[in-house]
Structures are given as C-alpha cells and as structure tokens.
C-alpha cells in the first residue's frame, strides 16, 4: 500500500504538536501545507523530527488570475509563487502545486502570463523543485501549460473534477504525469467544493482509484479534507479515526485495481 497522508491544516481545533500526534497515531506518514505558511520553518522542523514527510507545498492561489494581466499585480503574484518555489527548495520539499487560473471567467491566457510562468518554471528547475499544475475549471488553460512545460507534473484533485468540471476526466489526459494527489469528496453539485473526507459525498472515487492505479503514480494517497461543520459532532480524535478509515479504504481500492492489471 502507498503511504497515507493528509493536509496539515485538516483540523485546526488542536495545536500543531497535538495534530502531529494524531497523525502519527492514525498512520499518516506524509502531509502538505501552503508554501507561504507563516510558520513554515517551525512546522517543517516539527514534522521532520516526527518522521512525517512533507510531500509538497501548495502555492497561494488567491489572485492567481493576475498572472495573466499586464500589471504590477501580476508581477507581485509571480514573486509570491517564486517565494513558494524557493521555500520548497529551502526545506527540501520536492513539489509545488500551482493553480493555472481561477473562476468561471478567468482572463484569456497570453504571452504576458506565459512569460511569467516561463520564469517561474525556470527557477523551479534551477532549484530542483517540480511544478505540478492542478485541475480546476478550465481544461484548456491546464492543457496549454502541461504541453508548454513538458517537465511539469500533474496534481489530480478528485473533488475539483466532480464539482468544477462534471463529466470531465483528467487522469486519461494527464495521468502519466501525476506527481501529487488531492483526495477529497463533495456533493458533486456544481461549485460545491466541500473538501470532506472520501466516501462522505458523491464523487466517483471508485473510478478515481481505478484511474490512479493505472497511472505510474506511487506517491502518497494524500487527502485534502478539512474538519468543517460537516464534522462538528466529532472530536479531533474521532475525526482523525474517520479520516484514516476513509483514506485507507481508498488506498486499498487502488491496490485492488493495480493487482488486477498484473
């Protein structure tokens, strides 16, 4: 079985040390957090001492559309993303996950934005950090950058596929380049990006497990779920126990389909 992981901010009701203890108790060997986390130095040290790997960082995505505008705001966004790449290198985090654009009506992609992404990807390659582009709403924007940057990887987000692009499947297109996974569930209603635990919603996770098994990805089965009001009746301990059961169930299904193909 691939190792299990969960986003570090999955449960903010407990402090970092308590969260790490709960992760260890429930078999989570890896995690990730934002590349601009104000506590990145301290958290990286705590996780390292606990033997929990930091698989990747998620770059800031608020104002990501500014990357495509010929404005100083676009330059500022590039600087924030570049800082994230440099933080990954500084703390030996191999992958940074990046959104290409945001919203239903993002700006048209063009030379200004591509020049900025050129600089970002070049800096990442210089520092040995892999850029992974994540599926959001606009397949065309993602496909352009995946084609434009052949060394970039893909971050497969199961929840986004269901609630932002119903009926569309990303793994048949980019599965061979998968380097990160954001596993979470939702109601499969358009724009309902609930980020609940696997099997608590209506996402077709059986298909996701089958497609992941068919890909070369052997990295962490990483959940991007949060203890929201959906779990208000659960204690942190109960939430982590539920998370372990759900994520392990998905990992078992990946193993099942992989064994079938041998």
Task: Identify what each model region corresponds to.
Residues 1-83, 89, 125, 153, ...:
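N-terminal pre-domain/capping segments
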Residues 1-5, 13-24, 142-153, 162-262:
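Histidine-acidic metal/acid-base catalytic patches
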Residues 2-8, 31-33, 54-59, 96-98, ...:
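Hydrophobic faces of well-ordered beta-strands that scaffold small-molecule active sites
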Residues 8-16, 30-43, 65-67, 72-75, ...:
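Acidic-and-aromatic substrate-binding clefts and catalytic sites of carbohydrate-active enzymes
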Residues 27, 51, 92, 128, ...:
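Residue-level detector of structured alpha->beta connecting loops
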Residues 42-50, 116-124, 170, 207-212:
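Catalytic-core regions built around general acid/base machinery
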Residues 59-62, 93, 101, 186:
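Beta-hairpin (beta-strand-turn-beta-strand) motif
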Residues 68-153, 163-165, 218, 237-246, ...:
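Active-site acidic/histidine proton-transfer and metal-coordination neighborhood
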């Amino acid at each position: 079985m691939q190792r299990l992981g969960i986003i570090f901010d999955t449960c903010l009701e407990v402090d970092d040390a308590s969260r790490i203890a709960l992760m260890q108790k429930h078999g989570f060997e890896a995690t990730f957090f934002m590349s601009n986390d104000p506590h990145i130095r301290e958290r990286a040290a705590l996780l390292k001492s606990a033997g929990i790997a930091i698989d990747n960082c998620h770059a800031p995505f608020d104002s990501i559309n500014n990357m495509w505008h010929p404005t100083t705001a676009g330059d500022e966004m590039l600087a924030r993303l570049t800082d994230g790449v440099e933080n990954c290198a500084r703390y030996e985090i191999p992958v940074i996950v990046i959104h290409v654009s945001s919203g239903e009506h993002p700006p048209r992609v063009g030379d200004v934005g591509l020049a900025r992404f050129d600089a970002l990807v070049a800096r990442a390659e210089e520092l040995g950090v892999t850029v992974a582009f994540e599926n959001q709403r606009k397949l065309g924007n993602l496909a352009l950058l995946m084609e434009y940057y052949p060394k970039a990887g893909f971050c497969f987000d199961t929840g986004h596929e269901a609630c932002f692009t119903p009926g569309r499947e990303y793994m048949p297109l980019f599965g061979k380049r998968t380097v990160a996974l954001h596993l979470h569930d939702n109601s499969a209603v358009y724009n309902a990006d609930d980020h609940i635990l696997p099997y608590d919603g209506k996402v077709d996770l059986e298909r996701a497990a089958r497609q992941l098994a068919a890909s070369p990805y052997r990295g962490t089965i990483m959940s991007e779920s949060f203890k929201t009001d959906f779990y208000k009746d659960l204690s942190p301990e109960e939430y982590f126990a539920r998370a372990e059961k759900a994520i392990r169930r998905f990992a078992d299904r990946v193993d099942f389909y992989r064994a079938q193909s041998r």
